[in-house]
Amino acid sequence: MKYTVESLRQFGIQVAEKAGMSHQDAETLLKNLLFSDMRGVRYHGMTRLSGYVTRIERGCTSATAQPTITMDSGAVFSMDGNNGMGSTIGTAAMQACIRRAKEYGVSFCTVNHASHYGFGGFYAM
């Protein structure tokens, strides 16, 4: 059976929202999963959705956690993911790095206490 990317995106967003994620965070998660699938990296794509939901349901991962900065030296900083979804925490870290790189010329961030962040190439492309 074949599905369109859009139908998978909509389905995945509904599943993630039902698990407790905000619409915006669910969209971020699905962008990451589908980005991976569309590049042939299936083991980091939609196949992971059920596992992510299970971890939320079991209380292993927070569907709503937002990162906090725990160390800040300007261009270099650390974030605590507060046990949140890796895709949303990873996206927040990358966006913060981009903002800081514009200011400092370069930026580096470490993240701890977050779940699997998915397909790494998603953040670089």
Identify the function of each model-found stretch.
Residues 1-19:
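Generic N-terminal amphipathic, Lys/Arg-enriched alpha-helix
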Residues 12, 97, 122-123:
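Aromatic/hydrophobic pocket-lining residues that form π-stacking "cages" and hydrophobic walls in ligand
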Residues 17-20, 35-42:
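N-terminal and secondary-structure boundary signal
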Residues 23-34:
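Short, well-structured alpha-helical segments
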Residues 26-28, 98-103:
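Glycine-rich phosphate/diphosphate-binding loops that line cofactor/substrate pockets in enzymes
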Residues 30, 106-125:
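Glycine-rich anion/phosphate-binding loop at the beta-strand->alpha-helix junction
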Residues 34, 42, 77-80, 107-110:
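Short, conserved beta-strand segments within well-ordered enzyme catalytic domains
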Residues 45-100:
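Active-site cofactor/substrate anionic-group-binding motifs, chiefly glycine-
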